[in-house]
Amino acid sequence: MSYTRTIHSSASILKMNSALQISCLLVVLGCLLGSGHCQSEAEFTAKSREIAQMFGNPSVDKYTKARNLPALLAFYEKYSSRLRLTPQERNSINNAIRQYKAQRNQQVDGVSAQGGWLFDIIKTAISIIVKAVE
């Protein structure tokens, strides 16, 4: 009986291990990126429905809508690139949001502005965003 022994050089084993590790890394990254996109799409759909129900529903009172403006602004800032808007609409929304934030940040005697009049500043922007998500 003769035993044939295959001798692999350490360099060839190292190359094989490196290739295997890189392949595994690419598979893991592909899975993570793919599932991340799916989660983000599901999240976008859920948030857009929530925004449309809140701000597109005439039975929701003005003060409830005003209280939820930060959620609308966060939605727009996160997903503005996904909304089908004309450049003019996008510019109008951005200007209204800037004006809203400037007014909200103004303080009188150390207290920020109160009342529902801030809601009126971005009323047009709200209607454009609601149309875009419906």
From Swiss-Prot:
Swiss-Prot/TrEMBL GO biological process terms: cellular response to heat; cellular response to UV; innate immune response; response to bacterium; response to heat
Top-level taxon of the source organism: Eukaryota
InterPro entries cross-referenced by the UniProt entry: Turandot
A cellular component annotation (GO) from this entry: extracellular space
Secreted among keywords: yes
Leader sequence segment: 1-38
Record key words, sorted: Immunity, Innate immunity, Secreted, Signal
Cellular localization per UniProt: Secreted
Role: A humoral factor that may play a role in stress tolerance.
Homology family: Belongs to the Turandot family.
Listed name of the protein: Protein Turandot E
Organism: Drosophila sechellia (Fruit fly)
Phylogenetic lineage: Eukaryota, Metazoa, Ecdysozoa, Arthropoda, Hexapoda
Gene name of this polypeptide: TotE
